């Protein structure tokens, strides 16, 4: 059995409306899973269910072969790191890290050894006597993680731990979390609304929407083969271009609303005549020419980002974003002739929104 298993778990506040639809997830021992999605999608509620802070309406939760569905949080073998550091301001770093073990009745020598080891791992050795007010935001977050590490849990639960940090510190802490997981190899479940955190930290990503796991897969899988329109629109910056239209009667072209036809790379005859949504990432559209069969787009604006540029335009009433090389800087109002990589096209069912 996996290090952590959610088996058809649901959550309902009123006994009728499910805020978590039946959800099953197997997390291997030592695996790092990130739950990502917009505010209100249910990811933090699900994490709190694993922690025992919210009751499971239906289904079961298992940690290391033990059913913990009704078990008290303190008995589940979990340690949680929150968005707010929740450090005791009157205690030193050392005392904050040791406090949870002390109230559990652990011996002083064992506590000292665990705190010393956690401080070494997190490079807090020289800060053990300081108070939280004397620390930076990144140092406070490391203390919060140290407090979790000393418990030697079966599972780490992270609830948006980097949200309060500035952009530069978030990058640094992402790297430190990666290094920490490689060192400890503890099963981890991590919640964030930030897709960059999800893609850089996760071994597998669970994309959530409306209490449903839209897709579970590696970061590469959810980026390259999104299972639904929601995943396609949520993962990626800028988001995937999504264009509505229909597959022509021969299954050879996609007819955009507005009359533009785009060639399809075969295998779509069974969808002939059906309303669909075509997706393509901005980096899979290249500049071409009319002679080479390019499709024209009048550019509205150009975003210069430094390493590359983003050209914004329209096909009819549908918006399109194209990622250009650093040296490609067309002027607003100019016509760009575009070539779409046929092997990078994604088709989604017009009714269900699911990938076909």
UniProtKB/Swiss-Prot annotation:
Disruption phenotype: Mutant lacking this gene fails to grow on both glycerol-3-phosphate and glycerol-2-phosphate. One of its GO terms (biological process) is carbohydrate transport. SMART domains: AAA (SM00382). Pfam families: ABC_tran (PF00005), OB_MalK (PF17912). ATP binds at residues 37-44. Residues 4-235 form the ABC transporter domain. SUPFAM superfamilies: MOP-like, P-loop containing nucleoside triphosphate hydrolases. It is a peripheral membrane protein. InterPro entries: AAA+_ATPase, ABC_transporter-like_ATP-bd, ABC_transporter-like_CS, ABC_transpr_MalK-like, ABC_transpr_MalK/UgpC-like, Mo/tungstate-bd_C_term_dom, NA-bd_OB-fold, OB_MalK-like. Keywords: ATP-binding, Cell inner membrane, Cell membrane, Membrane, Nucleotide-binding, Sugar transport, Translocase, Transport. Its main location: membrane. PROSITE patterns: ABC_TRANSPORTER_1 (PS00211), ABC_TRANSPORTER_2 (PS50893), UGPC (PS51315). Its EC number is 7.6.2.10. One of its GO terms (cellular component) is ATP-binding cassette (ABC) transporter complex, substrate-binding subunit-containing. One of its GO terms (molecular function) is ABC-type glycerol-3-phosphate transporter activity. Induction: Induced by phosphate starvation, via PhoB. Also induced by carbon starvation, via the cAMP receptor protein (CRP). It is an enzyme of class 7 (translocase). It comes from the Bacteria. It catalyses: sn-glycerol 3-phosphate(out) + ATP + H2O = sn-glycerol 3-phosphate(in) + ADP + phosphate + H(+); glycerol 2-phosphate(out) + ATP + H2O = glycerol 2-phosphate(in) + ADP + phosphate + H(+). ATPase activity is stimulated when UgpB is bound to G3P. Transport is inhibited in vivo by increasing levels of internal phosphate. However, ATPase activity in proteoliposomes is neither inhibited by phosphate nor by the signal transducing protein PhoU or the phosphodiesterase UgpQ. Activated by gluconate and inhibited by fumarate. Belongs to the ABC transporter superfamily. sn-glycerol-3-phosphate importer (TC 3.A.1.1.3) family. The complex is composed of two ATP-binding proteins (UgpC), two transmembrane proteins (UgpA and UgpE) and a solute-binding protein (UgpB). Part of the ABC transporter complex UgpBAEC involved in sn-glycerol-3-phosphate (G3P) import. Responsible for energy coupling to the transport system. Can also transport glycerophosphoryl diesters, which are hydrolyzed to G3P and alcohol during transport. The G3P moiety can be detected in the cytoplasm whereas the corresponding alcohol is usually found in the culture medium. It was proposed by Yang et al that the complex could also transport glycerol-2-phosphate (G2P) in vivo, but it was shown later by Wuttge et al that UgpB does not bind G2P, questioning this transport activity. The Ugp system can supply G3P as a sole phosphate source but is unable to supply enough carbon for bacterial growth. PANTHER family: MALTODEXTRIN IMPORT ATP-BINDING PROTEIN MSMX (PTHR43875), SN-GLYCEROL-3-PHOSPHATE IMPORT ATP-BINDING PROTEIN UGPC (PTHR43875:SF12). This is sn-glycerol-3-phosphate import ATP-binding protein UgpC. It comes from Escherichia coli (strain K12).
């Amino acid at each position: 059995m996996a290090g952590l298993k959610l088996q058809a778990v649901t959550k309902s506040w009123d006994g009728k409306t499910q805020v978590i639809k039946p959800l099953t997830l197997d997390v291997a021992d030592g695996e790092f899973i990130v739950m990502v999605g917009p505010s209100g999608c249910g990811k933090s509620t699900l994490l709190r269910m694993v922690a025992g802070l919210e009751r499971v309406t239906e289904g079961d939760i298992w940690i290391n072969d033990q059913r913990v569905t009704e078990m008290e949080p303190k008995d589940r073998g979990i340690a949680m790191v929150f968005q707010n550091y929740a450090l005791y301001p009157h205690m030193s770093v050392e005392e904050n890290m040791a406090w949870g073990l002390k109230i559990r009745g652990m011996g002083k020598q064992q506590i000292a050894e665990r705190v010393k080891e956690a401080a070494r791992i997190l490079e807090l050795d020289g800060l053990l006597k300081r108070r939280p007010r004397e620390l930076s935001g990144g140092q406070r977050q490391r203390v919060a993680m140290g407090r979790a590490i000393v418990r030697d849990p079966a599972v780490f639960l992270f609830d948006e731990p980097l949200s309060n940090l500035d952009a530069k510190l978030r990058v640094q802490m992402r790297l430190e979390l990666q290094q920490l997981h490689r060192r400890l190899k503890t099963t981890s479940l991590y919640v964030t609304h930030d897709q960059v955190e999800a893609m850089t930290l996760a071994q597998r990503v669970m994309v959530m929407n409306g209490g449903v796991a839209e897709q579970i897969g590696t970061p590469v899988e959810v980026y390259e083969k999104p299972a639904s329109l929601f995943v396609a629109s949520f993962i990626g910056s800028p988001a995937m271009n999504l264009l509505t239209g229909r597959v022509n009667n021969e299954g050879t072209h996609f007819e955009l609303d507005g009359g533009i036809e785009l060639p399809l790379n075969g295998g779509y005859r069974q969808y002939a005549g059906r309303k669909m949504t075509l997706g393509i990432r901005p980096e899979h559209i290249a500049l071409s020419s009319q002679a080479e069969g390019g499709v024209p787009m009048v550019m509205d604006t150009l975003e210069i980002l430094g390493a590359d540029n983003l050209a914004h335009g329209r096909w009819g009433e549908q918006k399109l974003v194209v990622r250009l090389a650093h040296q490609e800087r067309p002027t607003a109002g100019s016509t760009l002739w575009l070539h779409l990589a046929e092997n990078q096209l994604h088709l989604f069912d017009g009714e269900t929104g699911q990938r076909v």
